[in-house]
């Protein structure tokens, strides 16, 4: 993997901050865009900027077709069964809030458990805390070692018959740790 080539795809990463190349880890809040995405957004604003699924005029229909075509592309990329399984949100925070307010409110009951890691972004802690206050669920936390790695043996001990969901960051925007989510 050529990291320099990947960085070159992201115009903003050509900047320096305090005399050093920009490194950006806060992708849960806003993800930097590669040139291809920036160009597509500019093209959208110049040629088909209209409400999706909200109009019968030409631009709205064209914008809707492009929107749904992108949903199909994402469906194929993540190997989803149907396009209605792909939900677009503005970012991780909104996605987690949607998960908690749909799955959590509907399917979790007092005494049920969610497992998080000690390295979670605030956006993956607060919604679960609010759900715990509303519904009496328990939040369990996976500890980590001095190297910033999750303790997987401790993680396995957290599971009970009341565990309903595990919500763990794959790559920590604070530590840079890549968690072994496939193994988890």
Annotate the PLM regions:
Residues 1-184:
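Pyridoxal 5′-phosphate
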């Amino acid at each position: 993997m050529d990291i320099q080539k990947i960085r070159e795809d992201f115009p903003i990463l050509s900047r320096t901050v305090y005399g050093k190349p920009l490194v950006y880890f806060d992708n849960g809040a806003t993800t930097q865009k590669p040139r291809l995405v920036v160009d597509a957004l500019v093209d959208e604003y110049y040629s088909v900027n209209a409400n999706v699924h909200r109009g019968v005029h030409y631009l709205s229909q064209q914008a809707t077709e492009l929107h749904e075509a992108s949903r199909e592309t994402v469906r194929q990329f993540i190997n989803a069964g149907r396009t209605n399984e792909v939900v677009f949100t503005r970012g991780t925070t909104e996605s987690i809030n949607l998960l908690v307010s749909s799955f959590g409110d509907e399917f979790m009951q007092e005494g049920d458990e969610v497992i998080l890691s000690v390295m979670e972004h605030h956006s993956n802690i607060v919604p679960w805390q609010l759900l715990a206050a509303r519904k009496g669920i328990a939040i369990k936390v996976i500890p980590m070692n001095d190297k910033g790695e999750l303790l997987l043996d401790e993680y396995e001990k957290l599971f009970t018959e009341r565990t309903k969901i595990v919500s763990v960051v794959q790559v920590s925007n604070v530590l840079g740790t890549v968690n072994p989510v496939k193994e988890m």
